[in-house]
Amino acid sequence: MKGTKKKTPCNKKLGGYLKEQKGRLYIIRRCVVMLICWHD
């Protein structure tokens, strides 16, 4: 299983996708926090 990491060129694509998802999650979380604070 160790050798499969080197062979996959889609690893970079996956990393970028994960980064994008992380950023989106962060934005959504901030919006939720702002909404909760705003309700109080």
UniProtKB/Swiss-Prot annotation:
Sorted UniProt keywords: Cell membrane, Developmental protein, Membrane, Transmembrane, Transmembrane helix
Region (Required for DVL/RTFL small polypeptide activity): 9-40
Residues spanning the signal sequence: none
Disulfide bridge partners, by residue number: none
Entry comment describing in which tissues the protein is expressed: Mostly expressed in flowers and stems, and, to a lower extent, in roots and leaves.
Any Gene Ontology CC annotation: plasma membrane
Pfam families registered for this protein in UniProt: DVL
Subcellular location: Cell membrane
Membrane topology: Single-pass membrane protein
One example of a Gene Ontology biological process annotation: negative regulation of cell population proliferation
Record field: transmembrane: 12-28
InterPro entries attached to this UniProt entry: DVL, DVL/RTFL_small_peptides
Transcription regulation found in the keyword field: no
Family: Belongs to the DVL/RTFL small polypeptides family.
Free-text function comment from the UniProt entry: Small polypeptide acting as a regulatory molecule which coordinates cellular responses required for differentiation, growth and development, including leaves shape, pedicule elongation, inflorescence organization and fruit maturation, probably by restricting polar cell proliferation in lateral organs and coordinating socket cell recruitment and differentiation at trichome sites.
UniProt xrefs under PANTHER family: OS01G0525701 PROTEIN (PTHR47855), SMALL POLYPEPTIDE DEVIL 1-RELATED (PTHR47855:SF3)
Protein name: Small polypeptide DEVIL 3
Organism of this sequence: Arabidopsis thaliana
Gene designation per UniProt: DVL3
